[in-house]
Each structure stands twice: as C-alpha cells, then as structure tokens.
Amino acid sequence: MSSREFRYRGYTLEQLQTMTLDELANVMPSRIRRTLKRGLSIENKKLLDKIRKYKAMGIDKVIRTHRRDMPILPEMVGSKIAVHNGKEFVEITIVPEMIGHYLGEFAMTNRIVRHGKPGKGATRSSKFVPLK
C-alpha cells in the first residue's frame, strides 16, 4: 500500500515550493493571503531568511522565535522551530500538512486545568466537604 501524495489545494509540495510569494498568496486562505499581499513584517522576513540560510547550509538546528503570527510557507517544511507560548519554547517540526496555518496555532498558550479533589487544602467553598 503506497502512501498518499501530499497536495495543498491541488498543488504538490514541489509546485508550491517553486512559487513566488505573490503566486502563493493566491492559493492560500484569505487571512494568510492578506498577510502576504501586505508584505511580511521585518521580524517575519528575518525569520524566513534565517530558515533559508539554515536550509542552504544544511544546519539541522532548532530556530527559536517569538513570532507566533508567521504564516507557515512551503519553503519552511522540514525545519525545526521553537515557538514561544508565553512561558516556554514549544518545539515544532514543520510538516506539509501545516502549510496555510500560523506558527502560533501549534504552540498552545494555556493548559487544560486538572483540579484536585475537594477537601483539605482546597478552596474555601469546599472546606466543609467531609473528609474520608
């Protein structure tokens, strides 16, 4: 059984990687299209240049960034990026399925809270729950 070839809106990864940013903007969802048409910010351009430099030199090092608003582009596939979530850096390996999303979508800023059982040391409202 062969694995299915990745396609993004009808284009293969190789076709996407050969497109310019303007051509790519027409394929992307509206939110990212707007970001690309207006031009990437200076910080996002610096991050993209760093990713390109690391790929050209063959460096397989994790790139740390606070840029959660950076759209994931086809040329970023295969890179390892650590995105800051407000407390720590969350390491992400970019795969083709992530194209068309933002880096911040893969670094959650809040955790699911698991509350303890009521009783000793709990909140004031559960102070009077009988202990076993």
Swiss-Prot record:
Gene3D superfamilies: 30s Ribosomal Protein S19, Chain A (3.30.860.10). InterPro entries: Ribosomal_uS19 (IPR002222), Ribosomal_uS19_CS (IPR020934), Ribosomal_uS19_euk/arc (IPR005713), Ribosomal_uS19_SF (IPR023575). Keywords: Ribonucleoprotein, Ribosomal protein, RNA-binding, rRNA-binding. One of its GO terms (biological process) is translation. GO terms for molecular function: rRNA binding; structural constituent of ribosome. One of its GO terms (cellular component) is cytosolic small ribosomal subunit. Protein S19 forms a complex with S13 that binds strongly to the 16S ribosomal RNA. Belongs to the universal ribosomal protein uS19 family. This is Small ribosomal subunit protein uS19. It comes from Korarchaeum cryptofilum (strain OPF8).
